[in-house]
């Protein structure tokens, strides 16, 4: 049985992904920040692991990841506090990458956002700036690891029933991305080796997810 750990397992994408992977036969460990999130993730079929990644040291992260074949980073500070945003979305994310390498976990899937990167264009006075900077640094660090990484870059997240269809050639005018579609893309990517070393930009669209992801070609450093 494939074993995977989802960091940020109580988030909306993490919960949706847990259910999908359990249905596909994965054994899911769901990393959560507080014990009061335990019952929710257990109900999704995952094994809860209480670990505050903002405060966790390297050894604790290595121990949490050991024995798994893949890790998904779907955690986030949630904005509002720049110091905590850098601590979680950049520093803790990078520690998790180092821990994955030390624990021998090869596959690493990062949930980022459409437009992330050093040229994100967000003004420093904008409250989104710390998040944009943190994600740019974390994504770039991941690209420079030895891991079999994939970065997902969905557009603005929405709720509601997922369409199951996306586009991997998004335009600026149509950037909404259903969280259920993000979870489905993550599951499809984990089953598609050709997505290794890819940054996949996508939004809701017209192509079935399996077809869209299956049509991608692996390009190292993309």
Protein language model annotation of sequence segments:
Residues 3, 69-70, 107:
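Structural motif
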Residues 3-26:
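N-terminal Rossmann NAD(P)H-binding glycine-rich loop of SDR-like oxidoreductase domains
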Residues 27-29, 35, 77-144, 150:
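Conserved Rossmann-fold NAD(P)-dependent oxidoreductase catalytic core, especially the SDR/UDP-sugar
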Residues 93, 134, 152, 173-188, ...:
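Substrate-positioning beta->alpha
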Residues 189-213:
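Core catalytic loop region at the nicotinamide-binding pocket of NAD(P)H-dependent oxidoreductases
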Residues 120-122, 161-164, 189-198:
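Glycine/proline-rich active-site loop of Rossmann-fold NAD(P)-dependent oxidoreductases
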Residues 30-95, 99-102, 190-194:
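NAD(P)H-binding glycine-rich loop region in Rossmannoid oxidoreductase-like domains
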Residues 118, 150-170, 202:
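Flexible, glycine-rich beta-alpha linker
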